[in-house]
Amino acid sequence: MTKLAQWMFEQYVKDLNLKNRGSPSFRKWLTLQPSLLRYSGVMRANAFDILKYGYPMQQSGYTVATLEIHFKNIRSSFANIYWNRDSEEPEYVCCCATYQSHDGEYRYRFVWYQPFIEAYNAIEAALDPLETIILNLIAARDLDFVVHIFPYNKGHEDYLASTQLILKIFIATLLMDILRIKDNTLDVHLNSDYIIVMERLWPHIKDAIEHFFEAHKDLLGYLIAFRNGGNFAGSLRPSCGQKIVPLTIREVLQMNDINLAVWREVFIMQECSDLVINGIAPCFPIFNTWTYLQGINQIFFENTSLQEKFKKDFIARELSKEIIKGQKTLNDKEFKKLSLHQIQYMESFLLMSDVAIMITTEYVGYTLQSLPGIISRSSYLSPIVKNILMDEDSFMSLLFDLCYGAYVLHKKENVIHADLHLNNMTYYHFNPTSFTDRNKPGKYTLKVKNPVIAFITGPKVETETYVFKHIDGFGCIIDFSRAIMGPNHAIKLERQYGLAFVNTFYRNQSEHILKVLRYYFPEMLTNRENEIQGVILSNFNFFFNSITAIDFYAIARNLRSMLSLDYLHTSEVKRNVEISQTFLDTCQFLEEKAVEFLFKNLHTVLSGKPVEKTAGDVLLPIVFKKFLYPNIPKNILRSFTVIDVYNYNNIKRYSGKAIQTFPPWAQTKEILTHAEGRTFEDIFPRGELVFKKAYAENNHLDKILQRIREQLANENL
């Protein structure tokens, strides 16, 4: 172990605040060993460093190209390229088709361009047959690549035309996805048009692809650079993902206004990321940064819901023209339904800008929508991962991760997710203690005996510590675009924006809460909607605690739905995976208890009485009782190897929002002190200057805001 790694481990363990907590035997049992560093939360600390120093971005000033393939009457985008200002060579590439989503377009495999192109060039000779096939299809006009550049830049267009970069990026993307198909690990919500393109292209490229995988197994390691962007800081983790959301004019001008969904999501993502780096919870992605992209229009996006945003923009602009002209009659039947108040509302919130926000975060694995298919079909997963759907302790570990994530979200952040469907929950295969041999499917090596994770969930420490089998990763919660902000945020909001804003914010949010309740519990609102809305507005503090049950209900209901998928119960799948009825019963039990908590406490609130506890305070000890430290036999505890600990009692001392608030193990001065003579560039190849530029004052951002204001004024809106 290097001196730097040893120091990071010691600093991380120190910040967990485990000393003098509980009995001597408990403290001894809970001790983390330096030899197990690579399986512990220190690797998430390392991931934070890699993201911040390996993927820095300024908050504006980028040109982005979206690359499309057109083949046999089907088109799909498959990658993005990013240039910083007027630099000739790209800075980043993202080799991935988009995922189907409502609120933005998500892709992973966002990587630094330099290691990407170096890796491709290293294996290009072996890919020559595949390149030739693609070029022949282009020559025959059966296949075409189409490029859209935002904002348009002739220099970048010429650069792409004079190189074979588009071809290289397509082949890199194709190789990664074919490999996932071979491993049966392709996500089910990947863009369906892209999957059709791959299927139609397969007969043409099958022999060349199979020859590459068979004859050049020694080169497969280079593909890691297409997914992880190179070997930063001695680690192949993490993967970085991007989410791009088109912005309304209001959203561009009112940065960090959490009354607007996109900024509310950014705020919550940053806060949840801080839970990870402070050793409180592993259940969220690490937030890297955000940047504005200019010149964006609907051509950039593929998802239907985002196309609808631009359609509403057109309607709103037409309405504005009608109003400005003073016309009293609106011809379109859709327009006739709208009152003046509604029209003004549309003007404020629906007019689209030509700016999108790109958010980069740690990629946290397969969605639970995809997980059953991956586990049941892949021959490359270790038994530890496969056991998530077969072994009770493993399944309960995943379930607890998600419930604990909801618990700390409610208690620490005063936020309810409110949209925990299967594509907003993931299994993050991270810190594996078992390793498979790609050349020998089914063979694996276990590096740690009986690995477990401990979660300290309250001030009583020892009696509130849960112990779970390590499942070569953990469950994560993502996408906070529909979250509910609790009453504790009111003071901060009033300080920033004034009391009138606070009242408007919570009044608007009450409509969203009713919509969520209407979706999950329609019978609850029967003849009581006005009464419930009145309580939301007058006594939200207690009402908030009662509706924290929504997230637990959604977790349980959707996991039960996942386990009930028809294909999991076919004879073919049952040969590999046998779903236990116990899992279904546990989910149903949690679901019922969540409903019981909600209805009981809603009645309490409507009676004018306080609700002091959140759903997690009540449900965790009931559902996971057998996993509490005091309830586990001593001989069993002694057989465990503790490889990770998370401590709810920690405060958020550190934050990823600014350099000054980074943890010690992410401060450049501290890192170099323990680097044994290595330079910053030795550890983080991007270099310190690139990082500092990303955090410097950005005058270009001010120019964007000024341009949008002028556009707004010129349109008389």
UniProtKB/Swiss-Prot annotation:
First-listed, main subcellular location of the protein, grouped into a coarse class: virion
Keyword line: Late protein, Virion
InterPro entries with a match to the protein in the record: Kinase-like_dom_sf (IPR011009)
Induction text: Expressed in the late phase of the viral replicative cycle.
Protein's cellular compartments: Virion
GO CC, alphabetical: virion component
Domain of life of the organism encoding this protein: Viruses
Family annotation (SUPFAM superfamilies): Protein kinase-like (PK-like)
Sequence similarity: Belongs to the asfivirus C717R family.
Protein name: Uncharacterized protein C717R
Source organism: African swine fever virus (strain Badajoz 1971 Vero-adapted) (Ba71V)
